[in-house]
């Protein structure tokens, strides 16, 4: 099915979201749409399928095959959506219904558009799970039991279950590690090609785009400013906004210049061929031994087991970690490797089945006797956490001002802060992360793009001047141009507060080379490699680390 958009203009209140946009996707063609956060990419997809806010004013033409969607009734659009047009949404954790099992979620379009018996539906869901690389044993699980990569695959399966003729993919690899990104893009493009369908692939990541499409449009502030073959845009960007995106992508992407280790494909990497032997490093071990007295946050032999009695899984398997004063430490690993569980355990937010966590020499998490745990107030007051999914972390009823000010309001009595001081601090933090306070103070989360919401979450985490900052995928929803600005902000903060310790959980290897000095690689709940960032990225010793590095090379 073709997509033909002509002179599409979209206004939300007094703001123009899309301005005279025209693009086309031929039948059976894969086309990319790239642009910075807030450029209007997601709104373009919503306009194409009629999923716009009630107060939106739209003009122009959008043809899905031979059907005009601009001005079409909800009844007519409902016949198209899910049957002929499949949408892969940006954040699967928000797009999927937490009340439904995986089978119920994937089968929903089938049950809406076709009259099928239960056995036929079940068989089709099982076949689709196999196509997207998911095990059959997750069929009865719900969204909160799945990793980020699994959630995205479920979202793709839901979009493709009816074999639609057009796929609209909105940032389908956001917040996924490099290996999973590569696998998801390869899987999605293969399925689309096998179905003979068309696809419009929306992203801010040129390294992902080069695998997903051959031709590309560039959107900037609601206007189409460039279009060409993807390779041409990468090699010879003609427009300023395109050049900025390409330059930022190259800066934040690993290059193949120093990687002389053998090539290991992600398909050959399993937990069986990953051992902990590669985690030994005499240089780092001796250096750490001399710094034990400056350790601020320590985890010893951490084990975490999750799930019900008949389906329990060990998520962390004896992890040791030291965060030193003033240090920036990165934790990398594939989706489901245990990264988020580890930092939650270190903050006392996750019950551990074995081990001990100390903060400033005080026990804050223990498996043996929870009565021995010290007062949490120091830990909670002096640490901040940037959550992986900003929209899930922001209260939809609160303005940006109230959300960012929340940590100060909690401790305002001890900090002796009045409303005016708090408001000034909020404005300072918003400016630091690149958001104009005048434009954003009174906005609500649903009025923010993914990147803008992530910036708000980072501002909230930094506002109370924490001793320890733990950031779980802090830039997963931010385009490459915005990432450079956030990196500059982090650099300025570290220069201003040299004693602040940071843990950055990330799947983006290009980012951690700018954020951290030391790195830990997690796979299947175990540390498989650690050392200085430059050493690990340039000369990975473990098969799993090599796969992550090779998948991230642009």
Model-derived features with residue positions:
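A short, surface-exposed alpha-helical micro-motif characterized by mixed small hydrophobic
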Residues: 209-211, 512-514
């Amino acid at each position: 099915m073709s997509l033909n958009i002509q002179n599409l203009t979209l206004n939300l209140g007094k703001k123009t979201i899309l301005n005279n946009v025209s693009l086309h996707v031929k039948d059976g063609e894969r086309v990319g749409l790239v642009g910075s956060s807030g450029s209007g990419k997601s709104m373009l997809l919503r306009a194409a399928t009629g999923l716009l806010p009630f107060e939106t004013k739209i003009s122009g033409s959008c043809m899905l095959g031979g059907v005009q969607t601009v001005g079409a009734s909800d009844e007519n659009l409902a016949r198209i959506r899910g049957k002929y047009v499949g949408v892969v949404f940006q954040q699967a954790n928000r797009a999927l219904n937490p009340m439904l099992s995986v089978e119920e979620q994937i089968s929903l379009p089938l049950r809406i558009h076709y009259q099928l018996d239960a056995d036929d539906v079940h068989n089709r869901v099982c076949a689709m799970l196999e196509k997207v690389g998911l095990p059959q044993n997750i069929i009865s699980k719900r969204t909160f039991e799945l990793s980020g990569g699994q959630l995205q695959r479920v979202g793709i399966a839901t979009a493709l279950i009816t074999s639609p003729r057009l796929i609209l993919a909105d940032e389908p690899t956001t917040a996924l590690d490099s290996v999973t990104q590569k696998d998801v893009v390869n899987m999605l493009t293969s399925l689309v090609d096998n179905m003979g369908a068309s696809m419009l692939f929306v992203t801010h990541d040129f390294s992902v785009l080069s695998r997903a499409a051959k031709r590309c449009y560039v959107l900037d502030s609601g206007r189409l400013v460039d279009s060409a073959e993807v390779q041409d845009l990468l090699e010879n960007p003609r427009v300023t906004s395109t050049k900025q995106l390409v330059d930022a992508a190259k800066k934040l992407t690993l290059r193949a210049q120093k990687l002389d280790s053998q090539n290991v494909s992600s398909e050959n990497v399993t937990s069986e061929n990953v051992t902990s032997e590669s985690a030994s490093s005499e240089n780092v071990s001796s250096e750490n031994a001399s710094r034990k007295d400056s350790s601020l946050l320590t985890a010893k032999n951490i084990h975490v087991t999750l799930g019900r009695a008949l389906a329990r899984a060990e998520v962390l398997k004896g992890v040791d970690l030291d965060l030193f004063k003033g240090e920036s430490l990165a934790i990398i690993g594939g989706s489901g490797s245990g990264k988020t569980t580890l930092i939650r355990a270190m903050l006392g937010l996750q019950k551990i089945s074995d081990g001990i966590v100390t903060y400033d020499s005080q026990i804050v998490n223990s498996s043996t006797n929870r009565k021995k745990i010290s007062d949490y107030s120091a830990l909670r007051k002096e640490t901040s956490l940037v959550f992986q999914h900003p929209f899930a972390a922001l209260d939809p009823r609160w303005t940006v001002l109230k959300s960012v000010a929340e940590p100060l309001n909690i401790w305002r009595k001890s900090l002796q802060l009045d409303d005016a001081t708090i408001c000034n601090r909020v404005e300072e933090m918003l400016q630091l992360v690149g958001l104009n306070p005048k434009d954003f103070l009174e906005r609500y989360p649903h009025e923010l793009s993914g990147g803008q919401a992530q910036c708000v979450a980072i501002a909230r985490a930094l506002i109370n001047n924490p001793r320890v900052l733990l950031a779980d995928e802090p830039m997963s929803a931010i385009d490459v141009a915005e990432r450079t600005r956030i990196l500059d902000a982090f650099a300025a903060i570290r220069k201003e507060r040299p004693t602040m310790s940071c843990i950055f959980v990330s799947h983006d290897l290009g980012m951690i080379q700018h954020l951290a000095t030391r790195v830990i690689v997690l796979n299947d709940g175990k540390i498989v490699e650690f050392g200085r960032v430059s050493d690990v990225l340039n000369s990975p010793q473990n098969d799993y680390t090599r796969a992550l590095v090779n998948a991230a090379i642009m």
